[in-house]
Amino acid sequence: MKDVIKDLSELRMSYEKGELHEAQVDTHPHEQFLQWFNHALQSNLHEPYAMSLATCNRQGRPHVRTVLLRGATAQGYDFYTNYDSQKGIDLAENPYAELLFYWPSLERQVRIGGIVNKISEHESTDYYHKRPRDSQIAAHISTPQSGIIANREELQQRFNRLYEQVGQQTVLSKPEFWGGYRLQADYYEFWQGRPNRLHDRLSYQNTDGTWVVQRLMP
């Protein structure tokens, strides 16, 4: 184990692909996010819309996992899940959360923090029916999410049973326990890797409706 730690201590790289200056960023953080996000999409990265979602329960215990961004507007950032999942339980107890996008090949990272609320049932249903058929079925049978299951075979059997039951049914109803959340941002941080660990970090803080940009120590 000591050899592994020693090896890890020697692993490092220099970041030299970009710079981040106050005079060059958009005055609104969502517009700045869209610039970086679109660049990530155009760079053909693997799932640039994947993001880490950090939540915390009322005892202060954090939980983090990777989810997919399914909507991004000035009103907020959307993701979908089982309401009875750990993230759903956490958000019912403590609605504050953070998102983290990390694009290593671009040497960029974005943090977005704020309060999370459920989106409308209409929006959730509309998105659910846009999902592939198999994904719709999976949403029905993978509950309670994070619950213990005996083995993979049991999960597959559940899927197969519902698949046979619905057959060619054109419309599969959205489960009541499944839907979307929207994070309304009040904080952003944009990180650009730089040489010698002197990274560029710019934060946006919403103060009385105005976004204030500040440079942070690396």
Swiss-Prot record:
Gene3D superfamilies: Electron Transport, Fmn-binding Protein, Chain A
EC main group: oxidoreductase
Enzyme Commission number(s) from the entry: 1.4.3.5
Cofactors (names): FMN
Superkingdom classification of source: Bacteria
The protein, known as: Pyridoxine/pyridoxamine 5'-phosphate oxidase
One BP term from GO: pyridoxine biosynthetic process
Lineage: Bacteria, Pseudomonadati, Pseudomonadota, Gammaproteobacteria, Moraxellales
Gene: pdxH
Pathway: Cofactor metabolism; pyridoxal 5'-phosphate salvage; pyridoxal 5'-phosphate from pyridoxamine 5'-phosphate: step 1/1; Cofactor metabolism; pyridoxal 5'-phosphate salvage; pyridoxal 5'-phosphate from pyridoxine 5'-phosphate: step 1/1
Record-linked SUPFAM superfamilies: FMN-binding split barrel
Protein function: Catalyzes the oxidation of either pyridoxine 5'-phosphate (PNP) or pyridoxamine 5'-phosphate (PMP) into pyridoxal 5'-phosphate (PLP).
Subunit structure: Homodimer.
InterPro entries given in the database record: Pyridox_Oxase (IPR000659), Pyridox_Oxase_CS (IPR019740), Pyridox_Oxase_N (IPR011576), Pyridoxamine_oxidase_dimer_C (IPR019576), Split_barrel_FMN-bd (IPR012349)
